[in-house]
Design a protein with these regions (language model features):
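Substrate-binding/catalytic cleft of secreted carbohydrate-active enzymes
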Residues: 33-36, 43-253
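N-terminal carbohydrate-binding accessory modules
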Residues: 1-38, 57
Length: 254
């Protein structure tokens, strides 16, 4: 940034708060950013969609860097769509255009991300080309198809796999982990081990912990009257639930 190397000490963030779900007020946004800054976090990934416009204004105000990500994900069907299928090309490009045209003047944004876990193929080559033509000043990112973007991005790679990149014959791109140190339960205990590697060589540029806040809803226990944060199958629906995969945050829902 501005000619100086930047180590990304980042976190992925869903728009969420424990009392109102995905309706996040400006006060909560400010609290999020202040907590991030207090904990030495300097960048946030808008996983996995462009965020409320106010969020970017606050990131500009506080000095928090942003990887802005298009709302493109085909997690459950990435073996089929969009890949090279021309009928999906307009939708893929439309998502890039909507992201860039809305937020291109936000100084906090340092990187455009094509999407998340959405297969590979010609459509992503076209998306990367579109982003570079519209804004050659910012980096491009897409983890599944690293050859078309400016970054060599991975998810949840081990320390040994990170070290292997040092001897990889085509290691010309900056290496980052767009998701790592999955914050589920009693985890993230070996974070210092990761940072020892990241700080050992200039080719490593940090990463984004998964993720910022537990996606849980403030609920009253009908038996005790006490407040607790419910998630997963707490409402009795065991078939259609993410179970504890919704509680991966570094911080609680409140």
């Amino acid at each position: 940034v501005n000619g100086k190397k930047l180590m990304l000490r980042g976190v992925n963030r869903h728009e969420f708060t424990g009392d109102k779900g995905r309706v996040v007020s400006e006060d909560v946004m400010r609290k999020d950013i202040e907590l991030m800054k207090q904990n030495n976090i300097n960048t946030v990934r808008s996983s996995h969609y462009p965020n409320d416009p106010k969020w970017y204004d606050l990131c500009d105000e506080y000095g928090l860097y942003v990887m802005d990500e298009a709302n493109l994900e085909t997690h459950g069907r990435l073996d089929e769509i969009p890949q090279d299928r021309v009928e999906w090309t307009p939708a893929v490009i439309d998502r890039q255009e909507a992201m860039v045209e809305r937020s291109k003047n936000e100084p906090s944004i340092i990187m455009w991300s094509i999407g998340n876990e959405s297969s590979t193929g010609k459509n992503f080559e076209l998306a990367a080309k579109y982003l570079k033509e519209k804004d050659p000043t910012r980096l491009t990112h897409y983890e599944p198809q690293r050859d078309i973007t400016d970054t060599y991005s991975r998810m949840y790679r081990s320390i040994e796999e990170m070290k292997a990149y040092l001897v990889y014959e085509d290691n010309t791109k900056p290496y980052l982990q767009c998701e790592f140190a999955h914050g589920m339960g009693n985890s993230i205990g070996n974070l210092q081990d990761y940072w020892d590697v990241m700080e050992s060589n200039e080719i490593f540029h940090g990463g984004y912990i998964w993720d910022w806040v537990d996606q849980a809803i403030e609920t009253i226990d009908p038996k005790t009257g006490e407040k607790y944060f419910a998630y997963g199958g707490d409402w009795g629906d065991e078939e259609f639930t993410d179970k504890n995969f919704s509680a991966n945050g570094l911080i609680f829902a409140d």
